[in-house]
């Protein structure tokens, strides 16, 4: 045994065992001390409701972790904080960044950055954790309302505004379609009505070669007639010159008369007639001469032959033919309009002798632009209107994308507001220090137990300057901010109501137009034209080739309607109106919940900074004690002002209404000059003749039964005589 003991001593086994015992003993004492501290913490009265609820509901180990000292559980605190911060950052990414219209690579980079910052911040800094939780009540404040207002505007745009614009675009497209339909119907009617005439023209143009052949035949035939008219046969040139000179002698003018075709042809016909008469006389002369010679040749007796052949000498009988010349002058067989007809036919024949050709020219007249559209072709009006509508929708979609980006950026204001509140909470002891907290009540109860001056219950006038965080109603101090926020929300509500009303009204109008604007277009036309040209002459053939082309018949029956052009308005159902108004209703609810959200800010900040909360509550209590001691003097200026307003004579209209309308008496009662409560039968009126200030019973007791209006300043309880400028402010 001695050897074993010496061996163990030489190896230092006993020293190591003793050291292990010391370490275990110290750890056991430390655990016992911490357990005692936890039990003492549990036995100690909590300073906040949150602390009390956590002590009541959580196990001891969790309580030790939550209210740990600096440096305790560093690894656990970092891991839990990093995990929580990373999850919150991912949720924030899904809410703000993921809806953006950006590249996926940029979204991945933003996700990694947000998750890293959230994990590091929550794992290392309580200020980051506090500011992150402050986002919840800040979302109920004006910053959150700004964020929700963007979604409200987006919902209004995507709901009634988008539907309103869609219906207006539908009507614009309907107008363009109607104009295009009318133009097409007019064009179709014009084409149908002019189709026979165009067919005639095309037929004439198509029969150009045959017409040219017929015209050449007519020209050839007319040349023979023209040669006959212009021929000099049947008379001698001497007769022509002699008769022409005699014709010119009839003219009284010195100017050589113009011989028309009619006169020339009559002259030539007359000369031919006279020439025939003269030839007849000459033939008669020759016949008598021939017969006289034959007679003389047959009768050889000289005397007898002269006597017997004497009748053959009666050539004067041939002059009887001169009588016919009178007929040549008086009854010449020439029509009176032959010359004019000949000239017309001659001119026509020479005109037809040219090549027959026809061209159809269409002239297009461009009208001015219509309804603001720079249309260059009526046929494309509907297409241009639809393109214009699509272009406007593209611009609006781009604006909506920009609005979504701006909405995501507005969340930065919420972050800034949360950090700003935390900084003001830690550095400005008066900032948002108007709450009657649990620790405030504990201080007052402890002072009351020690017999010192206490503050609770507060006076009636004092209750309007503080906030009781456990009351479920909106208090006077909070009400002014709630009313202001509701007034700021009123334009959004009015915009929603006006757009919904306009959308419903326009839908009703457009639907009525659609139901009662159906138009049926009917176009019916028929014709049958038949021209018969009889005869086998050249002119008849020519007329059959030309005028005969008019022998056409057609029957047209066109029916169309404006059903494709009628507007098809879209109406919003109850679900659409609810989706459009839900963000606006949420905005109004946020205005009402702002007071409770602002109370939650102080609770979160007090949980992370309990020592700072104790200092703030103690400062607020001491400040309240000072104000209580000088309550009368601090409120004197406001009391005197209200008393002077009550003594002022009312407006004559108000006085007349007061006399004539007994029902208005309850609304026109006077108020307490301290707390502004309505006059009751228990109210006290100052008996001083020139004062007559009204007090409720509780305020009169708080004034120690001294009227600040008519009591000299030196007799009041303090030397202060004006409102304090160092009051705590409400953290807006």
Curated annotation (Swiss-Prot):
Interacts with STAT2; the interaction results in STAT2 'Lys-48'-linked ubiquitination leading to its proteasomal degradation. Interacts with DCST2. One of its GO terms (cellular component) is plasma membrane. Residues 1-46, 98-107, 416-489, 598-732 are cytoplasmic. The keyword Membrane applies. Its main location: membrane. Pathway: Protein modification; protein ubiquitination. It is a multi-pass membrane protein. A zinc finger (RING-type) spans 672-711. This is E3 ubiquitin-protein ligase DCST1. The chain crosses the membrane at residues 47-67, 77-97, 108-128, 395-415, 490-510, 577-597. Keywords: Cell membrane, Cytoplasmic vesicle, Glycoprotein, Immunity, Innate immunity, Membrane, Metal-binding, Transferase, Transmembrane, Transmembrane helix, Ubl conjugation pathway, Zinc, Zinc-finger. Pfam families: DC_STAMP. Expressed in testis.
